[in-house]
Amino acid sequence: MTETHTTGVRGDSGRETAELVASRVLDVPDFPKPGVMFKDLMPLFSDGDAFREVIDDIVRYHGRDSFDTVVGIEARGFVVAAAIAYAAGVGVVPVRKAGKLPRVAYSASYALEYGEATLEVHQDAFTAGHRVLVVDDVLATGGTAEATLDLVERAGGTVAGFTVLLELGFLGGRERLTPRPVHALLTV
């Protein structure tokens, strides 16, 4: 395991925040399969001061009054979403893998490298016009994010923003989400 290199880092919240995130990301080779370099954000989550700084930065960036609810994408997005919701004094809604929610839900499927996955959100998660900040830990190809943004809108919410801690820019997720704006604290 190695630390993500911090020289030449960039992010939508500025160099200082990007460097903070980069300094707490570990590269794990060949996980979850050979040839993949997994970006482990657990060191950031476990560093209370750094995690608080990142969460405060996200709330400042979007503005405390610009969203009514935070949506977290399963699973690490739950960690980020709950912290942002607490800091902003709003509620949190999970977007889960298929079959994990107990009530009637909307579902959206998206392509994986070998197959398909489905996400769900409760149909009564939002009222019409509810402003929703969607967050996840990592943006890769954008399939999960695109499905989640579509689910929020189908459930009556208005996407107020989309934020990730880490964007793997070379995989094109940001472009896939156009014209929706993407806020990434660190882009590699």
UniProtKB/Swiss-Prot annotation:
Pathway: Purine metabolism; AMP biosynthesis via salvage pathway; AMP from adenine: step 1/1. The keyword ATP-binding does not apply. GO terms for biological process: adenine salvage; AMP salvage; purine ribonucleoside salvage. Its EC number is 2.4.2.7. Keywords: Cytoplasm, Glycosyltransferase, Purine salvage, Transferase. It is found in: Cytoplasm. The keyword Transit peptide does not apply. It holds the Pfam family Pribosyltran. GO terms for cellular component: cytoplasm. It comes from the Bacteria. It catalyses: AMP + diphosphate = 5-phospho-alpha-D-ribose 1-diphosphate + adenine. Homodimer. Belongs to the purine/pyrimidine phosphoribosyltransferase family. Catalyzes a salvage reaction resulting in the formation of AMP, that is energically less costly than de novo synthesis. HAMAP family: Aden_phosphoribosyltr. This is Adenine phosphoribosyltransferase. The gene is apt.
